[in-house]
């Protein structure tokens, strides 16, 4: 009995407790032609994700800014885009409480040469759409992160 307890204690103290798993890293680029280079990727539920959006274009933010807004499954991109388009002073991110609930994560708006990284964990399986919320961009700048069960 004492040996079993001793073995258990040694195992507990020898194992790093609370060791954080490094996030899986993805990079998506966007450009002056209003496209993302990727339409999506797949992760496992509970996996920490670090996503970098890099604007490889040359046009400045004021003229051709892009972002990446990750939304909850089932969110209508057309409806979300309509509300986002009215929010220029807020980086084209809706501010009403109901619509804000649909946002999982969002990068800053980026001009040519800029980049931003967001880190998030998607715990529930499903298809999480993402889009650029700059008016007129969502129809061609969208994709899906598919989350598979563990």
Label every PLM stretch briefly.
Residues 4-15:
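Sec-dependent N-terminal signal peptides
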Residues 16-21:
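Sec/Tat signal peptide C-region and signal peptidase I cleavage site
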Residues 35, 105-150:
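Extracellular/periplasmic metallocenter environments
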Residues 40-62, 70, 116-124, 129, ...:
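Beta-strand cores of secreted/periplasmic/IMS beta-sandwich domains, seen most often
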Residues 66-67, 143:
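Extracytoplasmic/periplasmic beta-strand context in beta-sandwich domains
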């Amino acid at each position: 009995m004492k040996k079993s307890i001793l073995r258990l204690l040694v195992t507990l103290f020898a194992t790093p407790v609370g060791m954080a798993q490094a996030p899986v890293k993805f990079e998506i680029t966007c450009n002056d032609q209003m496209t993302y280079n990727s339409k999506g990727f797949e992760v496992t539920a509970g996996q920490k994700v670090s996503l970098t959006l890099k604007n490889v274009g040359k046009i400045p933010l004021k003229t051709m800014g892009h972002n990446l807004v990750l939304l909850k499954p089932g969110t209508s991109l057309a409806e979300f885009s309509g509300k986002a388009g009215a929010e220029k002073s807020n980086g084209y991110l809706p501010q009403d409480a109901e619509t804000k609930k649909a946002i999982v994560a969002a990068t800053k708006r980026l001009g040519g040469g800029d980049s931003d990284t967001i880190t998030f964990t998607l715990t529930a399986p499903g298809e999480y759409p993402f889009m650029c919320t700059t008016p007129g961009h969502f129809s061609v700048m969208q994709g899906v992160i598919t989350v598979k069960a563990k």
